[in-house]
Each structure stands twice: as C-alpha cells, then as structure tokens.
Amino acid sequence: VYGAYVNDDYGFAARILVSRALREPVCTINYAKSAGVEGCGSSFVNRLEKNDVNKLQQQFFTMKIDESCCKPFSAIVPLTGTVGRVIGPIDSTQSEIDMTLARLGIPSEFSEEAQAQAQALPDAVESDKEIEKRVDLRDVGLVTIDGEDARDFDDAVWCAPLNDGEGGWRLLVAIADVSHYVTPESPLDADAQQRCTSVYFPTRVVPMLPEKLSNGLCSLNPGVDRCSLVCDMIVSEKGEVTAYQFYPALIRSKARLTYTSVWNALNGDVQDFLVRGGNLTDINNLYALFKALLQARGRRGAADFTSAE
C-alpha cells in the first residue's frame, strides 16, 4: 500500500499496488543526480555503491525491484532494488535493441516448456493426414508477396476472372493456420501472448513463435505443403464482395514474390519476377482486382494518410 496526503481536511489517501507489469526497469547512471540511477522511460531513482557506479557508467542495466517495496515507478519516493543484468554500452546498436526489449518487457527467449512443445512438432506437414480434413488447394497458383527482407510468409493470394458473363473474380486469401499447432493455454500460447506479435529491428527479429513455427510450419514457403485457413470470395466488377466462405485447406505456394518484383513486372520488367516463379497471368488478374477494390474504397469515402516510416 502506498499513498500521499491530499490535504489537511481529507487526510491520507491509500492505494493498493497489486502487481507490477515490469519488474526489472532498464536504467543508466545519472551523474546529475549524484551518481543515482535513472530509469529509461520512468521516474525510477535509486542510489548505488561507488563500486557499482564505476562498473556501470555508460552502460544500460536492469534493476531488480525490492519485493517489499510497494511504490509504483511514478512515486515521489525512490524505489529500492539491486542491480540485475548488464545489457551493454549505451552507444551500441545491439544494446539499444536489448534495452528496448527489456524496457517494454518483451522476452527475447522462449520458455523451456514452449521450446519443448515446438520441438515435439513434426518437421514437415503430414500431408496424408491433413488432407482428410482440409480442402486440397495445392494445385492452385497461390503466391506470397512480401518485402525484400521478409523471412516469415503468413499469407498468400490468388484470383481468377469469373466466366459467368457478369464479370468479377474469385479471390482466395490463405493465411497460415497457426491455431493448428498453438493450442489455447499451451506453453506456446502463453509465450505468444507475452509478445503479441513479432518485433522487427534493423538488425534483428524477435519472433512471436519459435523459429520452427515462425519460419517453418507456419510460414507459407514456396514449394512445400502448408496448413492454412482460407477465405474464398466472389468479388464483383465494382469491387464488392458478393459471397464468401471460410475453410481449412492444404496449400502449396507457387512463388515467394516481393513488392518490387511484382511492381516491376506490371511495368514490363519481368526478369526477377519470372526467376522467382511468378505467373504473369495471375499477377495481372490480381492487379485488375486491386484496381476494382481501390475504386470501391474511393466510393466509400475512405481517407488516405501520408506518413513517414
């Protein structure tokens, strides 16, 4: 319990601190505060012994909060704790990444239980078993389109014009069936909930799931069978979805395409696109559908925002 005096009439206001979301704040030495410790992104302040100060200057490090200390990071009175792990020099790019992960409470390692669950999974999709309960779309020309440096491919697309005399397209969007491998309340699920998403840095990726899943079973790599969930849609010439259904499927991506290779192919430079296994007919169909969807979006009055990434 902690509190502060409101005024003489109302006395003392008490609050209860149930738990801490972040138990080890990232800190640096702040000489302006008489060799005190200052938290990165919080008002955490503490004093260190002289030996610790000499060892930790110009370093990022964590502080383990004293469990008996019941004040929040925003309290006026300094928290108490001990030095945890040394992250690295404050002028290092790698240290900046590790500091950010620690400051936001994003784990960089998976629990032993999650790693064991991942290792127990098969190295490849057991197609003979999966095809009994999934729609077989392995002959459909689904492709992934991602950035140049992407390593995990979680969605694939394909479309073809309808021959019913009314125009429009059949569009398939397939996403990796993560729930087939990551069951609710399992160790993998618990670790994924801590991360919520994969975190991308300039020199490093912290995946939401172990590599066997993120770059393997749940990545729609070209030429291999993958379990997926599919949205199968009918889109009119006006870009309106007139029918759809969802179902589990077994797919086999035909190509790992990039935004650059696709755009170049649409503008006549097809070399890299073809090397990657792209199909010009399919990509032109997708582009025609895109333009219809874009026009429909404009008719709905959608707003565009320009921002720098």
Please provide the spans of the model-predicted regions:
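Conserved, carboxylate-rich catalytic/transport cores that coordinate ions
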Residues: V1-E309
